[in-house]
Amino acid sequence: TLLFFHGNAGNLQNRIYKLNEIAELELNYLIIAYRGFSGNEGKPTEEGLYNDSMAAKRWLNSNNIDDSNIILYGESLGTAVAVDLGSKFPFAGIILESPFTSMVELSKIYYPYLPVNLLLKDRYDSINKISKITFPKLVMHGDKDNIVPFSMGKRMFESFSEPKFSYFKSGDDHMMDFDQELLGNIKNFINELN
């Protein structure tokens, strides 16, 4: 089962194209709409999104799907949600599309003149959680990403322990082309888990 966490600019409706492609992989999947997204009530805080991911995990577990049969998939902001959950439980695998190291590091790029370290409440500090993820990882990132620097995806990949796999695509931007090449890499990764 693939547990999918979408990015900041996303909602359930504009991820259907990805889910249609993922369906070809003959996997069960669950995509959640965080609080404050897709018409849901609440504020999308870091703690709130982590709580939403835990609720999804518990729901899958209550439906007899063990963590060892769950693959986490995060895109952009969702990578931080996936990394947080993955740092706490042993899942089958984790796929990160366009990951960032931390919100503090990312914000320093956009606002170098502000003391973001002091101003940011939601830190999404993925880079300091990844050492706890011992199960297989796939990091995917386009080298023309104009939102999250490609260097952050590479740094996340390099910081992970083995087993790890990468799919770095020349010419792709933040929303990677969800084409047969990308799907093939996901499929190969999933086959490695079996």
What role is predicted for each listed range?
Residues 1-59, 68, 86:
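Membrane-embedded segments
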Residues 18, 126, 135, 149-158:
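Short alpha-helix in the alpha/beta-hydrolase fold that links the catalytic acid
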Residues 59-63, 67-113:
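Primarily recognizes the serine-hydrolase "nucleophile elbow" in alpha/beta-hydrolase
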Residues 143-148, 174-176:
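Acidic catalytic loop of the alpha/beta-hydrolase fold
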Residues 154-175:
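Catalytic histidine neighborhood in serine/cysteine hydrolases
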